[in-house]
C-alpha cells in the first residue's frame, strides 16, 4: 500500500532589488517612505492565506498571498510554495494592479516549444523543482512598480492516503517576515463522520499556539484555523522578524461503522475500504541486503540498527531469513526459520556481525531470496494461511554477475510469478532509482528512497512498520457486471493494518436505484467477503446538502487516481501499450487541468513592458537528488540568477582532475607528485574520440572534433577543437548531447533541449545538470562523478576561428576500476619518474626523460591552460608534454580510441 501522503506546504516570500529607480527631473527630491513594520527591502506581504478543503480525503488547496511595494523604486517579488510530490497543480494566477495573468495547462511538447523560444531570448524561469524528501517547490517572481500591489494564487489537489491509522496534512510554514493577515483555514468534510482531529506546530509554544489556534469537529465536519497576530508571530517581544518557521500538522481519522464506504456524486463513485479488528496474517519475510564495499561505514551501521529494531517487532508466528549479497551471495540460514525468541536472539547476533565487502551482485541475491520463499511454500515450511514478502535494500547499481537491468527484471518477474510482492529500498542517490521502482512495481510492490541522513535507520524501520501487519491477502473489489466503466485498480496483494484501499469509477447507468460492492480476501483464519450496498438517491442527496464542498470532487478524485495509476503502469510498458497509456493519461491531464509528467503549466507574466513566459513541469522522484526530486519527469527546471566565474564548480580540495581543452590538449593531473602530464591528439575534423568508458557504471563520454572555418591542409599548422560532446548512461537510458549552440537531453520520457543562453538546473533520478548562461555546464551522476563543459565563444564574424568546448572531469572517485578512454584510463593511480632534465630546442622548454608504464619517453616541459575559473584567459598549468599523440603514455595508439559516432 502507498504510504500516507503529507500535504506539505511551505510559504516563503522573498524580496530583492530588481531595478535601481526611475529616471526623472534632477530637481525632484525623493523622500523616503515610512515603511510598515516587518517589510523587507520595501516589500510588505500584508496577507497570506492557505485555504484547504478536504472532502472524502480529496484535498483542494488554494494558497493566496498579497504584497505591496512600499519602496520608491521597482522591486522583484518572489512567491515560493512547497507542495507534496504527490500533488498535481491545477491553477495559478498572478494579479498586478487588478490585471490577472492566468496559467494554462498544455501538453508538455507544445509547452516546450513555447518555453524554448523564450529560452533563446534569455527570458524564462522554470517554476517547479524538488525540495527535500516529500516536497517540490513552486517558484515565480515578478517585478512590481513602486506603490503597486501583486496577488499570487496557486491551486493544487491530491488524494490523502491513510498511513498508520490517520490522514495527515503537513504544512511547512515560512513567510520570512511579519504578515498582518496570516491564516491557515482548513475545512474537512467526511461523510463517514470524523473520529479524531488534532493540530500542532513545531515553531511555537503550546501556550501561544492555543490562543492562535482553533480546532473543532462534530459529526461529518471538522475545522482548523491558525491565525496568529503580529505579536504572536514575533520571535521575541521587541523583534521584527517572524518565528513562523517550521511544521504545522493537521491529523484526522474517520468513523468506521463498517469496513467499507461508498460515495456517489454526478455519476462517479469512490469506494473506501479499511476493515479493523482483524487478526494479523503471519508473514514470511526475506531481507535481501546489499553488503558491497559502498555500504561501508555509516550506511551499514544504520542498516544494522534498523534490522535490530525490526527484529524486536517480529511476531512469533512470522518466519524470516537474511540474504547478503556483494560479489557473492550468503545466507543466514539454509531455510526460513520461525521468529521464536531463540531464533531472534541468534538473528541479532548475525546482524551485528555483518560486514561490507566486494561488488554488487543484485541479481543473484534477489533470486536466492525468491527461491527460498518459493521452496518454503512448496515444502510446507510456513503456515498455509501466511503471506510472503521480499524486502531488498541496496545503495548502488548491479555491477557483478548479471548487471543488465532488463535481464534482472525478467529473471525476477519469472521467479516471483505474481505470488508475492517485492519492496525495494534505495539507499542514497548513487543508484538507478527508476530501475528499482520498475522492478518493484511490476512485482506488486513499491520502491522507497532512503535518504543518507542521521535518521536513515528510522526511515528503514518506518517503512517496515507500513508492511508489518497484513490483515488480508489477495484482495479483490467486485462490482455489478455492466454497471461500471473506467474502473481504477481493484485488485491488491495485501491490505495492511492502518492503511486504506481506494477504488473509483464511473457508473454506466446513472438511473440505477442501488449499488452493491463485494470485497473478497484471505484472512489469517478464513476467507472473508465484505458487502456494501447503498441507495444512490439517498447517498447523492446527503452529499449534495453540504454547500461548502466542491460538487465534482469524486470525479476529480477518480481522474487523479486514474492518472496516477496510468503513469505507474507506463513505467514498465513498451511499444504500443506505452503509447496507449500515455495518450490516456495525457487526455485526462488536459481535461482536468492537472500538471502531470505529461503536461506543463505555461504562465505569461509582464516583465519590463514585455510578456515573459515561464513553464511549470511536474518533477519526478527523483529527486530525489537532495534537490531533486519525482520519477515521472523528463526534466526539471529552476531559475537561478546568472552566475559569475566565481560560481563555477569547485571540486573538493585535493581532488585530481583531468581535462581536454583547446587544440585539443589533454591534461592529466597527478596529485601524488604535484605535477601534470599533457599530450595532444591530432585528427581530422569530424573524428569522434572515446574520452571515457566505464562498463560498471554504464557511463560513456565521446567528443567530436571540429576545425577552423578555414582549415589548413597542413597537419602541422591545422587547429582542431572539440565542437560536440556526447555523455551517456546506459543504466539510466540517458543521453546528453552538448554543442556550442544547445544542449539536448534524451531519456525514456523524451527529448528536452536547452540553450546556452539559459541558466537552468535539470534533475532526474541520479542526474543533476546545471547550465550557467554562456559559461559552462556542470553534470553530476549521483555523488562522485562530476563533469564540467566549458563554452568558448569567439566573435561570430571571426574569419577563421569558431566556438568550441572544453571538457573537465572534476570528480571521478565513483568511477570503477574498469574505466578506460583517452581520459578515463588515467582515473586509476599510476606513477612516473622524470630525470635527466636538459635544455631543449627552445630555451624556456627543457626536455627530460620520463619513465611511465614501463616505457621510456622523451618529454618537454610546457604549459597549458585551465579555463574552469576564467573562461577567457584561463589559469596556467605546468606539465610534461608527451609527443606523437601521447604515444607511450596512452594504452595502445590514439586511433584505437576513434569511434563511429557520439553514442
From Swiss-Prot:
Main location (coarse class): secreted
Glycosylation sites (chain numbering): 91, 580
Localization: Secreted
GO molecular function per UniProt: serine-type endopeptidase inhibitor activity
Keyword field contains Signal: yes
Keyword Secreted tagged: yes
CDD domains per UniProt: vWA_interalpha_trypsin_inhibitor
Pfam families in the record: ITI_HC_C, VIT, VWA
Domain VIT residue range list: 29-158
All copies of domain VWFA, residue ranges: 284-467
PTM (free text): Heavy chains are linked to bikunin via chondroitin 4-sulfate esterified to the alpha-carboxyl of the C-terminal aspartate after propeptide cleavage.
Positions bearing Aspartate 1-(chondroitin 4-sulfate)-ester: 663
Cited PROSITE patterns: VIT, VWFA
Pro-peptide positions on chain: 21-34, 664-903
Ranges that cross the membrane: none
One GO CC annotation: extracellular region
Family (UniProt): Belongs to the ITIH family.
Quaternary assembly: I-alpha-I plasma protease inhibitors are assembled from one or two heavy chains (HC) and one light chain, bikunin. Pre-alpha-inhibitor (P-alpha-I) is composed of ITIH3/HC3 and bikunin.
Protein name: Inter-alpha-trypsin inhibitor heavy chain H3
Source organism of this protein record: Oryctolagus cuniculus
Gene: ITIH3
